[in-house]
């Protein structure tokens, strides 16, 4: 696309030898669709927003992790106190003898699964490494680039150790209630979610959990679940032949008329209009 915004290496890296650096987004503002001359890891710390990656929408919040390739198109909209960090790197500049393809999904043709989650323990460990990496990537001493690459290797191994699929928190995990709740919500796309039953199972206060969730994500639990379902509906409308009523059921709405009302309120167009517009742009 001739008018596609492309982020350039020269605007982010200090020289042609630097392989890795950190770009803070405190907060991340609305950002138009773009690609890059480099790759990046996106780690979300707080708040929420709509991340559209290769035309697929994701409602993102704390703990979301993305592996972005240079050619991927993505944008940020509907942001609310969204705080994230981009760890950007040039694969061709990496010199460390590490099996990067085993560590980074999509690295130079490796199998690509872009969206993962980190629990609180993984986030804490990753944050420590990223802080060191940011310090070294801003350094000017002769070994700064080598130290930054070593820390990048440590980071991608830490992420691989702690990441998990969005709907599959390991049963042995020692993660927090908030991590368990977000995983439970991801498993409730098609069926009702009962917060009282969740709190009874986890032996926690419903009121306190609601407060914690809102403080960390900037949304209520119901708002988050509704928007995750709408994102899934947008994807199905664009990429499946299912009827609107069938998509409504698959996204947790038993009444297709109510689904259409909610979808229109959240996106500004009806499900049929969304499908028509998406098919036109393909």
From Swiss-Prot:
Domain annotation HTH araC/xylS-type: ranges: 179-277
CDD domains with a match to the protein in the record: cupin_RhaR_RhaS-like_N
Keyword DNA-binding: yes
Top-rank lineage group of the source organism: Bacteria
DNA-binding region extent: 196-217, 244-267
Keyword Transmembrane part of the UniProt annotation: no
Keywords, comma-separated and alphabetical: Activator, Cytoplasm, DNA-binding, Repeat, Rhamnose metabolism, Transcription, Transcription regulation
GO BP: positive regulation of DNA-templated transcription; rhamnose metabolic process
InterPro entries listed in its UniProt record: AraC-bd (IPR003313), Homeodomain-like_sf (IPR009057), HTH_AraC (IPR018060), HTH_AraC-typ_CS (IPR018062), RhaR_RhaS-like_N (IPR047220), RmlC-like_jellyroll (IPR014710), RmlC_Cupin_sf (IPR011051), Tscrpt_act_RhaR (IPR023699)
GO cellular component: cytoplasm
Pfam families per UniProt: AraC_binding, HTH_18
Subcellular locations according to the entry: Cytoplasm
Site positions per UniProt: Interaction with sigma-70: 246
GO molecular function, one term: DNA-binding transcription factor activity
Gene3D superfamilies with a match to the protein in the record: Homeodomain-like, Jelly Rolls
Major localization class: cytoplasm
Protein's job: Activates expression of the rhaSR operon in response to L-rhamnose.
HAMAP family from the UniProt entry: HTH_type_RhaR
Subunit and interaction comment: Binds DNA as a dimer.
Protein name (database record): HTH-type transcriptional activator RhaR
Organism expressing this protein natively: Salmonella heidelberg (strain SL476)
Taxonomic lineage from the root: Bacteria, Pseudomonadati, Pseudomonadota, Gammaproteobacteria, Enterobacterales
């Amino acid at each position: 696309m001739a008018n596609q915004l492309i982020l350039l290496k020269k605007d982010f890296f200090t020289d042609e030898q630097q392989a890795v650096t950190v770009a803070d987004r405190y907060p991340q503002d609305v950002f138009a669709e773009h690609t890059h001359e480099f790759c990046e890891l996106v780690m979300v710390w707080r708040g929420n927003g709509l991340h559209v990656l290769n035309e697929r929408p994701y409602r993102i919040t704390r703990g979301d992790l993305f592996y972005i390739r240079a050619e991927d198109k993505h944008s940020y909209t509907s942001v609310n106190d969204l705080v994230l960090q981009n760890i950007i790197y040039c694969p061709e500049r990496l010199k460390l003898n590490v099996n990067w393809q085993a560590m980074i999904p999509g690295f130079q043709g490796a199998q690509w699964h872009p969206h993962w989650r980190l629990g609180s323990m993984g986030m804490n460990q990753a944050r420590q490494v990223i802080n060191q990496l940011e310090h070294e990537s801003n350094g000017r001493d002769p070994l700064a680039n080598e130290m930054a690459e070593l820390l990048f290797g440590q980071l991608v191994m830490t992420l691989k150790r702690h990441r998990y699929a969005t709907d599959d928190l390991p049963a042995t995990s020692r993660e927090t209630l908030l991590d368990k709740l977000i995983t439970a919500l991801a498993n409730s796309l098609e069926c009702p979610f009962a917060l009282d039953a969740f709190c009874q199972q986890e032996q926690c206060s419903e009121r306190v959990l609601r407060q914690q969730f809102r403080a960390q994500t900037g949304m209520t639990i119901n708002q988050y679940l509704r928007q995750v379902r709408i994102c899934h509906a947008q994807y199905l409308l664009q990429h499946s032949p299912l009827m609107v009523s069938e998509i409504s059921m698959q996204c947790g709405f038993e009444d297709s008329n109510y689904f259409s009302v909610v979808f229109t309120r959240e996106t500004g167009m009806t499900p049929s209009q969304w499908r028509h517009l998406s098919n036109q742009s393909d």
